[in-house]
């Protein structure tokens, strides 16, 4: 389902500005305990597994559309605090990776 939404978004972006260079960034992985009551019980153990598969889904779509790709999970993890979001260091690492990727795209 997420893949369909990403495809629609890329189609719209390319229709709006066909010459734009696009960087598709897949999300970080959920923490192993995210589904527990003390974190976010709206998630399940299966949600953790799905989050780990999203990197491949996004990469396949990036290749299909000929856009650049970065896996956020390659540079940042979910925080211990909530098992769902990045901590400040993770945000900084992801920002640095995006900056580097955009610089590479511009050269």
Task: Describe each region flagged by the PLM.
Residues 1-107:
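Alpha-helical cap/lid subdomain in secreted, periplasmic
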